[in-house]
């Protein structure tokens, strides 16, 4: 029987394979208890074209003294930042790679904020 983490990693692997077959740039999300990370990765997976996370110094200042990066409000902020950085790099359309995480809570907040900021997926 697979552990919860092994199940998530298996789902993540399958998603990465499907996105690679499509040959499009992907927006990948990773979350921990304290932070959330988003990266835009090239079609072949060799380069990170844009990234944003709650671990960045500028974001931590915006979050305030508490530095809470593990909530939905912080995820929305990261969604907007990653969309702005991707658009600055000339990327309008991506495939959303949620890395096996459920499309709920922080992952959903990040995705919806990125869509509102103009990223298409």
Curated annotation (Swiss-Prot):
Q: What does this protein do?
A: This is one of the proteins that bind and probably mediate the attachment of the 5S RNA into the large ribosomal subunit, where it forms part of the central protuberance.
List keywords of the entry alphabetically: Ribonucleoprotein, Ribosomal protein, RNA-binding, rRNA-binding
Alphabetical list of SUPFAM superfamilies matching this protein: Translational machinery components
GO MF entries: 5S rRNA binding; structural constituent of ribosome
The record's listing under PANTHER family reads:
39S RIBOSOMAL PROTEIN L18, MITOCHONDRIAL, LARGE RIBOSOMAL SUBUNIT PROTEIN UL18M
Question: Which GO terms of type biological process are on file?
Answer: translation
Stated family: Belongs to the universal ribosomal protein uL18 family.
InterPro entries linked to this entry:
Ribosomal_uL18_bac-type, Ribosomal_uL18_bac/euk
Q: Does the keyword Disulfide bond apply?
A: no
Give an example GO cellular component term for this record: cytosolic large ribosomal subunit
Q: Which organism is it from?
A: Paracidovorax citrulli (strain AAC00-1)
What does UniProt list as this organism's lineage?
Bacteria, Pseudomonadati, Pseudomonadota, Betaproteobacteria, Burkholderiales
Q: What is this protein called?
A: Large ribosomal subunit protein uL18
- What subunit structure does UniProt give? Part of the 50S ribosomal subunit; part of the 5S rRNA/L5/L18/L25 subcomplex. Contacts the 5S and 23S rRNAs.
């Amino acid at each position: 029987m697979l552990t919860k983490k092994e199940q998530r990693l298996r789902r993540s692997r399958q998603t990465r394979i499907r996105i690679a077959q499509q040959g499009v740039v992907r927006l990948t999300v990773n979350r921990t208890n304290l932070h959330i990370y988003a990266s835009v990765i090239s079609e072949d997976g060799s380069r990170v074209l844009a990234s944003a996370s709650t671990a960045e110094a500028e974001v931590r200042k915006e979050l305030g003294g508490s530095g809470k990066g593990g909530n939905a409000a912080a995820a929305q902020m990261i969604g907007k930042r990653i969309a702005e950085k991707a658009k600055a790099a000339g990327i309008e359309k991506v495939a959303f790679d949620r890395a096996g995480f459920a499309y709920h809570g922080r992952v959903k907040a990040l995705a919806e904020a990125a869509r509102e900021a103009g990223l298409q997926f």
